[in-house]
A protein has these predicted regions:
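Conserved C-terminal region and hinge/linker of Rieske [2Fe-2S] proteins, especially
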Residues: 1-157
Length: 157
């Protein structure tokens, strides 16, 4: 029986292989640009703008999203295995998770586990999830997290 994979990671299709290499190369380039937390973020983004020509706003979104991915070890490990998420999907994940504020480690771990399961292929040549689908799934997970938090905080006065 054939292993599950996303259509965007199909190793038998030459176009898909090239697109995979582009995603992987771009991802690895930006991962290597993520600054240390004590770095001057504005200087880093300005320098990257000058050297890459990428809009500073996009650079900020990319770096913040990759920093967030470090907080999701299961999803990050899957990404390092499949390179199935392009930067726009990773940015969408970060933007959605920003709604959580400062969640507990348990909430982050639960979202990491469930999001990773959602973004793991379950059948051969499965269509890759769209940004909209990923956002909807994250909204469900965030709403569940909010309900859990509301249930543990007690009534408001």
């Amino acid at each position: 029986m054939e292993e599950p994979y996303f259509s965007t990671t199909n190793t038998t299709d030459p176009t898909t292989r090239l697109a995979f290499e582009m995603r992987k190369t771009e991802y690895e380039f930006w991962v290597n640009q993520v600054p240390e937390l004590d770095s001057d973020f504005e200087l880093v983004t300005q320098s990257l703008y000058r050297t890459t020509g990428v809009n500073e706003g996009r650079i900020v979104h990319i770096l913040m999203a990759l920093h967030r991915l470090e907080e999701l070890p299961e999803l990050q490990a899957l990404q390092h295995r499949l390179y199935h998420l392009d930067l726009d999907r990773i940015i969408a994940i970060n933007k959605s998770l920003n709604r959580l504020g400062n969640p507990t480690p348990e909430v982050v771990a639960r979202i990491d586990e469930q999001l990773t399961a959602y973004l793991t292929p379950t059948r051969p040549n499965q269509t890759m999830r769209t940004q909209a689908q990923i956002k909807r799934k994250l909204n469900e997970l965030i709403n569940l997290a909010d309900d859990t938090l509301a249930g543990t905080q007690g009534p408001t006065q």
